[in-house]
Amino acid sequence: MAIMRKSHPLMKIINHAFIDLPTPPNISGWWNFGSLLGLCLVLQILTGLFLAMHYTSDTLTAFSSVTHICRDVNYGWLIRYMHANGASLFFICLYIHIGRGIYYGSYLYTETWNIGILLLFLTMATAFVGYVLPWGQTSFWGATVITNLLSTIPYIEQDLVEWIWGGFSVDKATLTRFFAFHFILPFIIAALAMVHLLFLHETGSNNPMGIPSDCGKVPFHPYYTTKDFLGVIMLLMLFLTLVLFFPDKLGDPDNYTPANPLNTPPHIKPEWYFLFAYAILRSIPNKLGGVIALVMSILVLALLPYLHTSKQRSLSFRPLSQTLFWVLVADLLLLTWIGGQPVEPPFIIIGQVASILYFLILLLLMPMAGLIENKLLKW
C-alpha cells in the first residue's frame, strides 16, 4: 500500500496533499480551521442536495415546499436546520481562518491570500442567494434591498437591476435564477478551494513564529490528521448542540411569515454573519458611498500584503500590533451588533465611528505600528 500511495497517479495527489506533506512542527490549533472549512463545505453540499430534491423554486410553492420538508420528509427538519445553521458555522470558521491569516502574517503568500478573498466573496454570494430561497418576509425584502444596491452603478443601473431580477421586481424569475446560482456556486467554491490548496502547497504553511521552518518539518499524517480530527469532533459537538437544541437561535422570526410585497417588515436585516458589512453600508448617508464602503470592507484585505511594514511576519512578538488586532476584533463585534439595531441615535453615530475605526486600523494604524516596532527593536 505504501508503494501504491506514492506511485498511483490519483493516490499520489492525495499523498502529497494530506499524508506526506511536509508541515511546520509548531502550528497551533488556529491552523485547524482550513480543514474545518472543507468539512463545512462538504456538509453544506450534501444537505443542500437532499433539500433540493424536495424544494420547488416557484413563488407560489417555495414557502410551502420548505414547510413540507420540515413536516413530511423523513428527517427533513434535521436536514433543513443542519443546512441553515451549517452556513453560520461556515462563516464562524471562515472569519477565524481570516483572523488567523491576519494575525500570523499569512497574507504574505499573496496568491493563496487573493484566492481566499475570492472564496470569501463567492461564499457571501452563495449565502445571500440561499437566504432568498425559503421565500419568507426577510428573504423577499432582503433580496429587494440588496439587489437594489446595484442601482448605484452609473449609466447601466436600471438595466442591470432588471436583468438580475428578470423583470420589474423581485419575483418568480428572480427566485428561479437564485436557486440555480445557489446550486452551482458551492461547486465553484470547491474547485477554487483546490486551487487555494495548490498555491498553499507551493510555498508550504506559515507558522506562529513567522519564520521559515524548512529544517524541521514533519509529515502531515499522523500528526496533523489526528489534530484536525480533534477539531472536527469539537466542531460537530458545537454544531449538533446548535441544531438540536437551538435551531432557530440565529435565524429571523420574520422568515416564518410568507413573502408579502405589500407589507414591509419593521427592520430589514441580513443574517448575523453579514451584519458588520451591513453596518458599514448604513453608516454612510450616501447610497453610492455606502456601496463602495461595503465592497471595500472586504476588498481592503487584498491590500494587506502591500501595507505590511514590519520586519517580522507574525504578530507573536509585536505587542503594539497585537493590541490593534484585538481592537479590530472588538470593532467587528461592535459593527455586528450595530447592524442588527434600528437606524436611530445613538446607533447611527456608534456605527459611523466603528466603521471609520475599521478602515483606520487596517489602512493606517497597523502599518504605522509595524514601523514603530521596527524602530523600537532598532531594525
Swiss-Prot record:
Keywords: Electron transport, Heme, Iron, Membrane, Metal-binding, Mitochondrion, Mitochondrion inner membrane, Respiratory chain, Transmembrane, Transmembrane helix, Transport, Ubiquinone. Its cofactor is heme b. It is found in: Mitochondrion inner membrane. GO terms for cellular component: mitochondrial inner membrane; respiratory chain complex III. It comes from the Eukaryota. The chain crosses the membrane at residues 33-53, 77-98, 113-133, 178-198, 226-246, 288-308, 320-340, 347-367. Belongs to the cytochrome b family. This is Cytochrome b. It comes from Geomys arenarius (Desert pocket gopher).
